[in-house]
Structures are given as structure tokens and as C-alpha cells.
């Protein structure tokens, strides 16, 4: 847990509506995990000398945020995190972030389902993919390598 989550965890409880939004979001994240491992497990195993048998997880830095947590982390007042519609996906570098984004675009195209936001964001210390899916009125907003202070 981060310092922010420890300080604010008590009030960071999603409602039933938020949980439904999180379930919708996790379907996409599970498809991302499966496709990531299908496409890149062999490459990773070759780099590790063929000793690879465990699939890589998708690591989520942030999903639902209460208004208090969102404010504490400097989130936008209209953030999709406030409704449980967004997740920030940890990336090991720009290459992984771009590959995650490509997979999510492919999933959207193949399923003919839209997402709201697909953003690659970075700060001085890290890079992540911000991905959001709303129940309706998804905008398919794509933006790569946005700088976030912090």
C-alpha cells in the first residue's frame, strides 16, 4: 500500500454502483492480462533461458478512489476513478505501456466495444496506463505520454 492509501483507506469504500463499474472494468483488464501473456510469454521465457511457466499479472496501481483519496493524490475533480470506471496500470517502461495500449485498442476493435479513456501517463518516477470504461457514453479518448507532476 502507498502512503496515501494507508492514510485514507478508511473512507475509500466503493458503493454497489461503483462495484458494478469495477466489474465491467476488470473484464477488460482480464482480457489484457490474457492477451499480454499470449503474445509475450514466449519472448519473456526466451530472455530467461526458457525457464518460464508462470503468467505475468497485470499490476493495478489505482482503481476506485473516494473523493477524499482522489483529492489527496491530486486527481481531477471529474476523474473516472471516482465512479470505479478507471484503473491505472503499472508499467515497467514505455515499451510495455505502448504494448498494453495496443492490446486494449485491439480488444476494443475486435469486440466492437468502446472505452472512455486510454492514456499513457508518466511522472519523473514512473509510467502507467490509465484506462477507463463507462457504462455508456464512452468517448474513446486516446492520449500517449502525458506528463503528470509528481
Which residue stretches match the model-derived regions?
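Catalytic cores and adjacent binding grooves of peptidoglycan-active enzymes
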Residues: 78, 83, 91-150
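Short secondary-structure junction motifs
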Residues: 55-57, 115
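Active-site acidic/histidine clusters and adjacent loop/turn architecture
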Residues: 1-45, 49-55
Amino acid at each position: 500500500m502507498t502512503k496515501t492509501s494507508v492514510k485514507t483507506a478508511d473512507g475509500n469504500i466503493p458503493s454497489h454502483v461503483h462495484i458494478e463499474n469495477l466489474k465491467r472494468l476488470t473484464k477488460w483488464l482480464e482480457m489484457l492480462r490474457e492477451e499480454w501473456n499470449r503474445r509475450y510469454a514466449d519472448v519473456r521465457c526466451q530472455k530467461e533461458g526458457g525457464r518460464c511457466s508462470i503468467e505475468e499479472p497485470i499490476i493495478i496501481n489505482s482503481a476506485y478512489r473516494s473523493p477524499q483519496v482522489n483529492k489527496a493524490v491530486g486527481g481531477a475533480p471529474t476523474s473516472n476513478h471516482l465512479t470505479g470506471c478507471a484503473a491505472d496500470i503499472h508499467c515497467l517502461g514505455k515499451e510495455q505501456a505502448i504494448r498494453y495500449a495496443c492490446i486494449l485498442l485491439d480488444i476494443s476493435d475486435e469486440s466492437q466495444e468502446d472505452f472512455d479513456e486510454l492514456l499513457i501517463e508518466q511522472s519523473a518516477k514512473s509510467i502507467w496506463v490509465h484506462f477507463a470504461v463507462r457504462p455508456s457514453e464512452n468517448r474513446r479518448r486516446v492520449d500517449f505520454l502525458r506528463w503528470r507532476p509528481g
